[in-house]
Amino acid sequence: FIEKRKEILRGGTADWATGEALAFGTLLLEGTPVRLSGQDSGRGTFSQRHLEYFDYNTAQVHTPMMHLDPRQARFEVLDSCLSEYGVMGFEFGYSLGDPLTLTLWEAQFGDFVNGAQIMIDQFIVSCEAKWGQPSGLVLLLPHGYEGQGPEHSSARPERFLQLCAEDNIQVCNVTTP
């Protein structure tokens, strides 16, 4: 795996996971803390991320992003329980309490965001209008992964576009040209 990543970088191209790792590393070295949570965030649902390595001999988890530089910002990657509503609510609160941290919540599959829809409707898209309190929570919603079925593959981006009003959220579909 590590050799494959090195080969990608030598070739001048990067897949999504490599670009994401480079972005996280850059933010950490510049002093911005990063917190990522979701059901399978360390490894990545599609085995693409590999932010954590498990040593089967010692039963220890190693997170290389935590060891880039002694002066770097804090990095947390958390594999959460299967309670989208509860975990997204916690991460929303975390983003309010620590607005200088890049706080990300990732749905394991696109349709898993359904379980947190109340949190999105009542808090995330309306917190600034209701309480004058902006949130920097980033939702990572896998979308368009064919082969998982029509529901499992859809994060329902149209639903988020309908929630956009007065600059309350940004909906981005990050892809390659």
Q: Model-found features: residue ranges?
A:
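Flexible, glycine-rich loop/tail regions that form catalytic "lids" or insertion modules at the edges
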Residues: 1-177
